[in-house]
Each structure stands twice: as C-alpha cells, then as structure tokens.
C-alpha cells in the first residue's frame, strides 16, 4: 500500500512539473528571463511574440 502512495505522489510530481513547461511566458519576470520585453501593443516587425506580460493586452516580444 505504501508503494501505491509513493507512485501516486511521483505521478503528481511529474504531471505538475510537466504543466510548467507548457505554460510559456505569462508574467513580466518570466518575460525578462527569456530575454524579452513587454510591449503594450503588438510586437514590432523585427520581433516575435513569445507570450504575454499582464493579461492578454501586453505582449512579451523577443528578437527573431
């Protein structure tokens, strides 16, 4: 029975860690860590959007 609890805890750990990799950039701190800048409108032509900074209105942009 203890083995089942251990395996269940390991499964939750793996699934919670995996969800972090699929989120992308979602706040200003992670934007800067990913070498991006927060832009209140759309990204300029020489940059691509890698996420959002605050809500959906402010984009996180990085050079292509």
From Swiss-Prot:
GO terms for biological process: cell chemotaxis; defense response to bacterium. Its main location: secreted. Residues 1-26 form the signal peptide. The keyword Signal applies. Gene3D superfamilies: Antimicrobial Peptide, Beta-defensin 2, Chain A. Disulfide bonds join 31-60, 38-53, 43-61. One of its GO terms (molecular function) is CCR6 chemokine receptor binding. One of its GO terms (cellular component) is extracellular space. Keywords: Antibiotic, Antimicrobial, Defensin, Disulfide bond, Secreted, Signal. Pfam families: Defensin_beta. Tracheal epithelium. It is found in: Secreted. PANTHER family: BETA-DEFENSIN, DEFENSIN BETA 4A. Belongs to the beta-defensin family. LAP/TAP subfamily. Has antibacterial activity in vitro against Escherichia coli, Staphylococcus aureus, Klebsiella pneumonia, and Pseudomonas aeruginosa. In addition, the peptide is active against Candida albicans, indicating a broad spectrum of activity. This is Tracheal antimicrobial peptide. It comes from Bos taurus (Bovine).
